[in-house]
A protein has these predicted regions:
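Rhodanese-like catalytic fold shared by cysteine-dependent sulfurtransferases
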Residues: 2-132, 155-193, 202-348
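Short hydrophobic beta-strand that contains or immediately precedes a catalytic carboxylate
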Residues: 149-153
Length: 348
């Protein structure tokens, strides 16, 4: 029996786009010491496949991190299975705020060294000794306190389209880079309230534990992240201190939280907060593109990529063989191929 998906990704994506069955986008995580990651991974894959779950699941000795899509009619069966696993009983399931059911098109369950890459090598660090969880109402109360410093634990391209009012938003590309930046920024503020947030909670849970490990006393994290916050403020009629869009790592690339558009198109500078991946298979750069520029550049990030896209498929394939994209994934929104960004770098 195959324990991984062998089907062509493009075909699966087209199948998902045309599917009419309602699906619910769900995310969850749990820091827990898993001893046999391979066996746990295989068992989980078989059960998720049987439930027609799609998405990405990362398993590591430190725990599990999942962003998935579940057929809505099977959501309760999925919940029963998941809660039947001892360490996952009662784990928070974050349901998407703005969901079209097209978030994922295939299932990947991968074993990794860590569920969140952090670059830390301190064997005395215990990720389970986290900061205090706060709900939306408590978050708002802390946010109004002059002694509170709010820190966005996401990457620059995420906070670019949406963030909390008065939050420090480090200009970083990766979580491991951000940990060091935040540590340096806060080194003389150990007695103040440190209030951290991220998309669903997994990054600020590790970050809050690390800051406590470093001696910070009053460390708080937004329970359930932006996803749960948006749901709570809507259900309870609370003040919404988040503005813009919540970036998500699936086909949607974002959830609309408020109507505020705080970013600009990376090609013309027009107000826009819609992310896209360059249509050139040799690039796939993530950037912000308005509708007009999408038409002008045929969904590409630059004239160069648009010209490449017009070439016959076999020539495009040959060109891709000579490209070493390396860690280009972390150049999201920074490439100087993008017209507006190129102009900004020259004038900035």
């Amino acid at each position: 029996m195959a324990l991984h998906n062998k089907f062509d990704g493009r075909l699966l994506k087209e199948k998902m786009k045309s599917a009419s069955e309602p699906r619910t986008t769900v995310s969850f995580y749990k820091y827990h010491h898993i001893t046999d990651t391979a066996d746990f991974r295989n068992s989980l894959y078989l059960q998720f496949e049987a439930l027609q779950v799609l998405g990405r699941v990362y398993i590591a000795p430190e725990g599990i991190n999942a962003q998935i899509s579940v057929p809505t009619t099977r959501l309760e069966a999925f919940r029963r299975y998941l809660y039947g696993i001892d360490f996952l009983e009662g784990v928070r399931l974050n349901l998407a705020v703005d969901d079209n059911g097209k978030s994922f098109f295939k299932l990947k369950v991968l074993v990794r060294k860590k569920i969140v890459a952090d670059g830390l090598n301190d064997t005395s660090f215990d990720v389970t000794r986290r900061g205090k969880h706060v709900n939306a109402e408590e978050f708002n109360q802390l946010a109004r306190d002059p002694q509170t410093i709010i820190v966005d634990m996401r990457n620059h391209y995420e906070s670019e389209v949406g963030h909390f009012i008065n939050a420090i938003r480090p200009d970083v590309d990766t979580f491991r880079e951000e940990l060091q930046v935040v540590e340096d920024l806060m080194k003389d503020q150990k007695d103040r309230n440190l209030l951290m947030y991220c998309t669903g909670g997994i990054r600020c849970e590790k970050a809050s534990a690390w800051m406590k490990h470093l001696g910070f006393r009053n460390v708080f994290q937004l329970d359930g992240g932006i996803i749960q916050y948006a749901r709570e403020v809507k259900e309870k009629g609370l003040e919404n201190r988040f503005i813009g869009k919540n970036f998500v790592f699936d086909e949607r690339l974002g959830e609309r939280i408020t109507l505020d558009i705080i970013a600009v198109c990376h090609q013309c500078g027009k107000p826009c907060d819609d992310h896209a991946n360059c249509k050139n298979d040799g690039c796939h750069l993530l950037f912000i593109q308005c509708i007009e520029c999408g038409e002008k550049y045929k969904g590409c990030c630059s004239e160069e990529c648009r010209e490449t896209l017009s070439l016959p498929p076999e020539i495009q394939k040959e060109l891709r063989r000579g490209i070493n994209k390396g860690r280009q994934v972390f150049k999201k929104g920074r490439s100087e191929k993008i017209p507006y960004m190129k102009k900004e770098s020259k004038t900035g």
